[in-house]
Amino acid sequence: MKNLILLFLLISIINLIQSLPLDSVINFYVNSTVGSCKGKQLEVSLDVCNNGCSNSFKITSSKDNVNNYNFTSYIETDDKQCLTNNYTINLFNCSIDNAALVGPYSVKCIFKETPSPSNSSNPSPSPNTTSSSSLSSSSLNSNEPNQTTKPPKTNEPQKNNSTSNIPNFFAIFGFLVLIIFILGDKI
């Protein structure tokens, strides 16, 4: 019986550690088809907020050799929670010819606190939190002819399946079992 309770306690501690507000990862898929993009800049907007927030990633690229593009994204947001979800995003400002850039890619959001204004009742237009992230791709095909088409900028986030706001009932249950176990020994 004691071993079972200790097992519950161990699992509860692991769950609580995983639920701590550490660096989060956003996984997303690039489902757009990309052709030759020589001399052009790839940009992607990705909504990372739960409830209609307008903050988004802006991902730009720089070509390091014939077929490899390095992507770097930056985000500024007043939402301290970096969601962990799968999103569908579209590339634009580049020819949409050939299935060449695929995912998923992981974006690590590192949040850094900045001093809040003295008057907290008035919301500040500047973000209270910032983060930066980077990712890379080595699967961009540069054999297609260069085009100048510019599709409209679009965001297509998938259904939000985040459970970060749901209480960890299993961890709470484990601690309750531990308390009962301690009180039972004293009685």
From Swiss-Prot:
A single GO CC term for this protein reads: plasma membrane
Name assigned to this protein: Ponticulin-like protein K
Query: For bias kind Polar residues, which ranges apply?
Result: 147-161
Propeptide residues are 162-187
PTM note says:
The GPI-like-anchor contains a phosphoceramide group, rather than a phosphatidyl group.
Q: Which residues are glycosylated?
A: 31, 70, 86, 93, 119, 128, 146, 160-161
User: What is the gene name?
Assistant: ponK
- Keyword hit for Glycoprotein: yes
Q: Which family does it belong to?
A: Belongs to the ponticulin family.
Q: Looking at the record's lineage, which domain of life comes first?
A: Eukaryota
Q: How does it sit in the membrane?
A: Lipid-anchor; GPI-anchor
**Sites of GPI-like-anchor amidated asparagine lipid linkage?**
161
Q: Where is the composition biased (Low complexity)?
A: 115-146
